[in-house]
UniProtKB/Swiss-Prot annotation:
HAMAP family, sorted: HTH_type_MurR
Species whose genome carries this gene: Escherichia coli (strain ATCC 8739 / DSM 1576 / NBRC 3972 / NCIMB 8545 / WDCM 00012 / Crooks)
This protein's name: HTH-type transcriptional regulator MurR
Entry keyword annotation includes Transcription: yes
SS bonds (residue pairs): none
Top-level taxon of the source organism: Bacteria
């Protein structure tokens, strides 16, 4: 379940005691084998129940399950570290050669994919695919890089017969949102989940009775609280990156999975439409 990743992405919503626990676990992950919740509570000056509740908040049944999972994650991470050149673990710097930058970016994208896929709740994903498949109309919202991901998904969905709107202009996005109806779906893409334009559109969609599906990070956010369904994405950040590259990689992995899942639901008809689309575009060459 990648608890270290969940801890990192949920930090903004931790209480003071929860932050103490998170800091301790990360600082001592290599030594957790010999740490009990009682010892930890005493050292941090908090109650054992606080530690158990923290573990449950992350999705574990209790501290023992969380502790063992963290030990396993640490061991797996060490194995990967030993297999990679040490200089690939730092952020990209202005002194890096293009070859080193390429290797770092590649690894960053790999991690974004691995961590995002590890967080998938596939039963929930299947339910989301079914909800989208029944929608008379689908709106996709997003800003910046997220808008590019949304536009790509909209083209894919239109290719297999879905009625989709994905407008770049935020005023148009808001206008479409207020016209949605019960049964319609809004797919809101925002890693932060706090962009006011996207939140406004989600509020309008909910008010109209549409189903809101958020593709966002694990952190608590206004969009996450508004959504009927969430699809979690994980992405690291680096100092010398001018664009959210790994974020888009993670988001694309989610949208591509949605698309393939929808094709699978109605494979014969979907493949016919994809073939017709290909034949038509070939005639334009």
């Amino acid at each position: 379940m990648l608890y270290l990743t969940k801890i990192r992405n949920a930090e903004s919503e931790f209480t003071e005691n929860e932050q103490k626990i998170a800091d301790f676990l990360r600082a001592n992950v290599s030594e957790l084998q010999s740490v009990s919740s009682r010892q930890m509570a005493k050292q941090l000056g908090i109650s054992q129940s606080s530690i158990v509740k923290f573990a449950q908040k992350l999705g574990a049944q209790g501290f023992t399950e969380l502790r063992m999972a963290l030990i396993g994650e640490y061991s797996a991470s060490r194995e990967k570290t030993n297999a990679m050149a040490l200089h690939l673990h730092s952020s990209i710097t202005s002194d890096d050669s293009l070859e080193v930058i390429a290797r770092k970016l590649n690894r960053e994208k790999e991690l974004a994919l691995e961590q995002t896929c590890a967080l998938f709740d596939y039963a929930r994903l299947q339910k989301i695919i079914e909800v989208i498949s029944k929608a008379p109309f689908i709106q996709i919202t997003g800003l910046g890089g997220s808008a590019l991901v949304g536009r790509d998904l909209s083209f894919k969905l239109m290719k297999i017969g879905y009625r989709v709107a994905c407008e770049a202009d935020t005023h148009v996005q808001a206008t479409v949102s207020q016209a949605l109806k019960k049964g319609d779906v809004q797919i809101a893409i925002s890693y932060s989940g706090s962009k006011k334009e996207i939140v406004l559109c989600a509020e309008a969609a909910r008010k109209q009775g549409a189903t809101v599906i958020a593709i966002t990070s694990l952190a608590d956010s206004p969009l996450r609280r508004l959504a009927h369904f969430t699809l979690d994405t994980v992405s690291g950040e680096t100092e010398w990156r001018s664009s959210s590259m790994s974020t888009r990689t993670a988001q694309n992995s989610v949208t591509d999975l949605l698309f393939v899942g929808l094709v699978q639901l109605n494979d014969v008809e979907s493949l016919k439409m994809i073939q017709r689309s290909s034949e038509l575009t070939q005639r334009l060459k």
